[in-house]
Amino acid sequence: MTLEYEQFVQQLTRLAESRELYKKLPLLRHDLVHSPCCLHLTVPNSTRNTGGHIELLITFSRVYREPLLLIRVWATTALDGIETSQLAHSAETMATLRIPSYLTLGLDTILDAQYPHALQGAWYSVHPCDTRDIVGDDVTVRDTYLDRWVSVFLLWVCR
């Protein structure tokens, strides 16, 4: 089963407006972006003593016709009493995320002017090629596909 973009938009909008996602994740911030439709989430980085946060973007892969998870890990440091956030190095990112073996992480870049400027740039992406095998391919649950996808692809970030 593949997801059509219109189905993705409908399910993502429902997910963003419901409180279910916020019960499952310790969200610091969330924004539903409408064009192109994506959900921008910020969660605390609970694996590092130095603080920081993890930035998540749920968007749509038109190639695979599946949801796509993009991730950036930010480290917070203090210099002369002023806190700053900067992108974590790849080794720190890998250690922070503790990626399950069934997921493949790669480097991706958003350069599309349709996305807000703050979302453009380098991201790690969880490759969507095996999504159907991981989430399930049952047509009878098509209307809740994104809910199942979130439970597999998103909740491990906050463990």
Curated annotation (Swiss-Prot):
**Where is this protein found?**
Preautophagosomal structure membrane
Q: One cellular component GO annotation, for this chain's record?
A: phagophore assembly site membrane
**Active site residues according to the UniProt entry:** C129
In which broad location class does this protein mainly occur, judging by the first location in its UniProt entry? Answer: membrane
Assembly with partners or alone: Forms homooligomers.
Q: Which Enzyme Commission numbers does its entry carry? A: 2.3.2.-
Provide the function of this protein: E2-like enzyme required for the cytoplasm to vacuole transport (Cvt), autophagy and nucleophagy. Acts as an E2-like enzyme that catalyzes the conjugation of ATG12 to ATG5. ATG12 conjugation to ATG5 is required for proper localization of ATG8 to the preautophagosomal structure (PAS). Likely serves as an ATG5-recognition molecule.
Instruction: Name the family.
Output: Belongs to the ATG10 family.
Q: What class of enzyme is it?
A: transferase
Q: What is this protein called?
A: Ubiquitin-like-conjugating enzyme ATG10
Q: Name one GO molecular function term.
A: Atg12 transferase activity
Keyword annotations for this protein? Autophagy, Membrane, Protein transport, Transferase, Transport, Ubl conjugation pathway
- Is the keyword Transport in the record? yes
User: Which BP terms does GO give this entry?
Assistant: autophagy of mitochondrion; cytoplasm to vacuole targeting by the Cvt pathway; piecemeal microautophagy of the nucleus; protein modification by small protein conjugation
